[in-house]
Amino acid sequence: MAKISKRRQAFAAKVDRQKLYPIDDALALVKECASAKFDESIDVAVQLGIDAKKSDQVVRGSVVLPAGTGKSVRVAVFAQGEKAEQARAAGAEVVGMEDLAEQIKAGQMDFDIVIASPDTMRIVGTLGQILGPRGLMPNPKVGTVTPDVATAVKNAKAGQVQFRVDKAGIIHATIGRASFEPTALRTNLSALIEALQKAKPATSKGVYLRKIALSSTMGVGVRVDQGSLAAQ
């Protein structure tokens, strides 16, 4: 921990917390800091110009990152009949109905995302207290409650990330790994920003994208000049 602390301190000394870095420079700094023994994630925090306390200004959605997330995702699907077969063909690891619900109640949750066909919500709805706190509860706003379960599975496997604004009005998301090429990280960040723009509440006034900062898992935040994103 001492070595990590010293490395973090050395990196922090290189970063001007008040400066807005061009995206290429910001990514170079963040990747330089990502020297842990594991492939650190590259995360983004976006401060939105919304009032998170107002229900009509809750920003939530999902986006498929063009370059993926660098993470292998296991998918569980609530579906029956033909839709169940389609989910399996698309790559879902676990597919079921009441049997899947019983597995979840027993604590057997070896998956990262849950998708549900609308006609199964009578079953899924009973699992809210288990799935909700874990961020696994299917929701139509992020595309995990859908009649097209096959596409939802493919999107999850392809690198879909979900986002939801927190109480402070900030969106947190992962846009890849430290091992990614800068071009891949830029592409993923642009896709996320575009999705956030599309999710802008009609009642949001003033500047919507207020601040954007990048960091690695063990690193410090580097603020990004939004003008450099538009120039990509």
UniProtKB/Swiss-Prot annotation:
Belongs to the universal ribosomal protein uL1 family. Binds directly to 23S rRNA. The L1 stalk is quite mobile in the ribosome, and is involved in E site tRNA release. Keywords: Repressor, Ribonucleoprotein, Ribosomal protein, RNA-binding, rRNA-binding, Translation regulation, tRNA-binding. GO terms for molecular function: rRNA binding; structural constituent of ribosome; tRNA binding. CDD domains: Ribosomal_L1. It comes from the Bacteria. PANTHER family: 54S RIBOSOMAL PROTEIN L1, MITOCHONDRIAL (PTHR36427), LARGE RIBOSOMAL SUBUNIT PROTEIN UL1M (PTHR36427:SF3). The keyword Heme does not apply. This is Large ribosomal subunit protein uL1. It comes from Burkholderia mallei (strain ATCC 23344). Part of the 50S ribosomal subunit. HAMAP family: Ribosomal_uL1_B. GO terms for biological process: regulation of translation; translation. One of its GO terms (cellular component) is cytosolic large ribosomal subunit.
